[in-house]
């Protein structure tokens, strides 16, 4: 994350203000009589603990700067020049690490997003090719999860008559899953030559992705039974001898919002219902969070797009081996590597850009 400390006046003033606040709280808490009179003693103690971390970073940064300046005087000595130059480089690297810690400290905590996530992939325009691309994207996210040793579970899928999927929902289990994958939401466009294309013409197809956090039970919205319509039907997926013999698949409709969720992955109707309810609650929660996080949405939309399904975020051009992320004008020529799960080369740059934008927002 590239961010200049010394040249950014707003950042210097922000850190100065926080340092003064730390000193102010320290004086209050050090006086037992004054501290007891404070109605918000607990909150002050909590704020002090947090600011104490920043204070340690700032002290380390000051110490490193002093060491660098004192070592620079040794550069004038021919015998000590190389040694001094090496020492300065070592401390400059340490300085970068401390500065990054300070930047991360300033970014608002998103504890509510430390959770598993659901990735919902739907075919768009392009017919057969779009369905095949849904399958390819599903495989890409599963491969990515395998590389990171994250557990995955296919919650629901709808087969296409031409092969691939019309729609698939994957659950990715890891506390960092949502924060890492949240910017995958949006429109994904693929350009490639279909196997059945005899004249070598490139076809363009689209898929849309929605990434939703799986919230803890106590954070999930309460759903009235009267607001639900639950239908059962026979599974069309893999199920061995039980396939199409029992109505084990579940379709849940949330009547007030008209959100519909299906699950047919399990043989058990009860398990399918539980999975479908999880997805439904996560969709409802995602809508609530979107409304509450207006400030974050402004940053997200201005920098990274709205995350809406209609908002094209990425193009995969197979003939050229190219992937372009339109939100940050990033182009790489490693399409096979990405489709095999190395998504970090696309994910990390956009997360860094997002963090930088949040810092700029804080300093306004």
UniProtKB/Swiss-Prot annotation:
- Key word DNA repair present in the record? no
Alphabetical list of SMART domains matching this protein: PCRF
Residues bearing the modification N5-methylglutamine: 241
Annotated Gene Ontology cellular component terms: cytoplasm
Q: Which GO terms describe its molecular function?
A: translation release factor activity, codon specific
Query: Could you tell me which SUPFAM superfamilies the record lists for this protein?
Result: Release factor (SSF75620)
| InterPro entries, alphabetized | PCRF, Pep_chain_release_fac_I, Pep_chain_release_fac_I_sf, Prokaryotic/Mito_RF, RF-1
Query: How is the protein modified post-translationally, according to the record?
Result: Methylated by PrmC. Methylation increases the termination efficiency of RF1.
Principal cellular location given in the protein's record: cytoplasm
Which superkingdom heads the taxonomic lineage of this protein's source?
Bacteria
Record keywords = Cytoplasm, Methylation, Protein biosynthesis
Report the subcellular localization. Answer: Cytoplasm
State what this protein does.
Answer: Peptide chain release factor 1 directs the termination of translation in response to the peptide chain termination codons UAG and UAA.
Family classification: Belongs to the prokaryotic/mitochondrial release factor family.
- Report the HAMAP family cross-referenced here: Rel_fac_1 (MF_00093)
Tell me the protein's name.
Peptide chain release factor 1
């Amino acid at each position: 994350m590239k961010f200049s400390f010394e040249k950014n006046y707003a950042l210097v003033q922000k850190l100065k203000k926080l340092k003064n606040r730390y000193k102010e709280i320290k004086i209050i808490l050090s006086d037992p009589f004054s501290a007891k009179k404070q109605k918000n003693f607990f909150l002050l103690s909590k704020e002090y603990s947090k600011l104490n971390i920043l204070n340690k970073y700032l002290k380390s940064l000051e110490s490193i700067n002093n060491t660098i300046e004192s070592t620079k005087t040794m550069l004038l000595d021919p015998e000590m020049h190389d040694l001094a130059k090496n020492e300065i480089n070592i401390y400059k690297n340490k300085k970068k690490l401390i500065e990054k810690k300070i930047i991360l400290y300033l970014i608002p905590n998103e504890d509510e997003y430390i959770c598993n996530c659901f990735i919902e992939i739907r075919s768009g325009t392009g017919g057969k090719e779009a369905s095949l691309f849904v399958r390819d994207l599903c495989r890409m996210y599963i491969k990515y999860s395998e590389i990171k040793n994250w557990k995955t579970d296919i919650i629901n899928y709808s087969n296409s008559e031409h092969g691939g999927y019309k729609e698939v929902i994957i659950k990715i289990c890891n506390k960092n899953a949502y924060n890492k994958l949240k910017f995958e939401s949006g429109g994904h466009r693929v350009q490639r030559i279909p196997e059945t294309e005899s004249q070598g013409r490139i076809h363009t197809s689209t898929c849309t992705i929605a990434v939703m956090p799986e919230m803890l039970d106590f954070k999930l919205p309460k759903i009235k039974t009267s607001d639900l319509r639950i239908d059962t039907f026979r599974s069309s997926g893999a199920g061995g001898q039980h396939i199409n013999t029992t109505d084990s698949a579940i379709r849940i409709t949330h009547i007030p919002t008209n959100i519909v969720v299906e699950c047919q992955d399990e043989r058990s109707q009860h398990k399918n219902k539980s999975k479908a309810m999880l997805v439904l609650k996560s969709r409802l929660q995602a809508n609530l969070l979107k409304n509450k996080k207006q400030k974050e949405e402004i940053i997200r939309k201005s920098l990274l797009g709205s995350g809406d399904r209609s908002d094209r975020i990425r193009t995969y051009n197979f003939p050229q081996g190219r992937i372009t992320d339109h939100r940050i004008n990033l182009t790489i020529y490693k399409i096979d590597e990405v489709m095999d799960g190395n998504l970090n080369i696309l994910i990390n740059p956009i997360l860094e850009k997002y963090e930088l934008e949040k810092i700029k927002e804080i300093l306004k």
